[in-house]
């Protein structure tokens, strides 16, 4: 999945519902950056709610030939803290001759001069992932994003692209503000269940507080 709510709705509809039937939810994290928290949160939330908490990330693509271990550590740390547990390096190539060397580098293979030292970084990733997955994440807040309402209206042509972009920005801001206040949360959909443990469909987690995002119409 890509970062923006607009792109997700146009191609996937309600991505959270789709993730719920995945054996291993996954994201595509591109660039020398840490993406909006929604990209990581939507996959890690569904994995906690329906599975074992494992989430795959195709990562480090487009980080550039000059990327450093420190930069890679920052990129992966930003994903791990939001629930990503398994890396899939982007990419490895049989050859980087000619134009191949321009195919969204860096390449995480023997062509890199630092390849022999990469195992130390990989060990750090492994240890960090072990630390995150051995414990049990404790959070009490569920955020219902506006995907369901927007998807229905988007298909009917009732929402303009500008309005969807506005709702997407508000949803991203809500997530960033909650994390800034150190309020961890999951994303979810209304089909998760009711207001008691007996009513909820999802057997793995129970939330004490639910926040409906602006644009959530279908509850």
Placement of each model-derived feature along the sequence:
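Carbohydrate-binding surfaces of carbohydrate-active enzymes
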Residues: 1-219
């Amino acid at each position: 999945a890509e970062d923006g709510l607009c792109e997700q709705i146009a191609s996937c509809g309600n991505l959270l519902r789709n993730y719920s039937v995945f054996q291993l939810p996954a994201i595509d994290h591109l660039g020398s950056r840490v993406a909006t928290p929604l990209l990581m949160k939507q996959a890690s939330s569904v994995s906690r709610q329906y599975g074992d908490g494992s989430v795959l990330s195709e990562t480090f693509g487009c980080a550039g030939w000059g990327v450093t271990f420190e930069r890679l550590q920052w990129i992966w740390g930003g994903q791990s803290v939001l629930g990503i547990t398994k890396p899939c390096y982007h990419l490895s190539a049989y050859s980087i001759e000619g134009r191949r060397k321009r195919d969204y580098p860096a390449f995480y293979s023997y062509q890199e001069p630092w390849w022999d030292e990469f195992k130390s970084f990989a060990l750090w990733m492994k240890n960090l992932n072990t630390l995150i997955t051995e414990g049990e994440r404790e959070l009490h807040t569920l955020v219902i994003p506006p995907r369901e309402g927007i998807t229905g209206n988007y298909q009917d042509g009732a929402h303009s692209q500008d309005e969807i972009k506005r709702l997407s920005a508000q949803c991203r801001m809500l997530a960033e503000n909650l994390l800034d206040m150190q309020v961890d949360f999951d994303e979810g959909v209304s089909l998760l269940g009711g207001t008691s443990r007996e009513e909820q469909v999802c057997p793995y987690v129970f939330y004490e507080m639910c926040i409906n995002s602006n644009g959530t119409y279908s509850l």
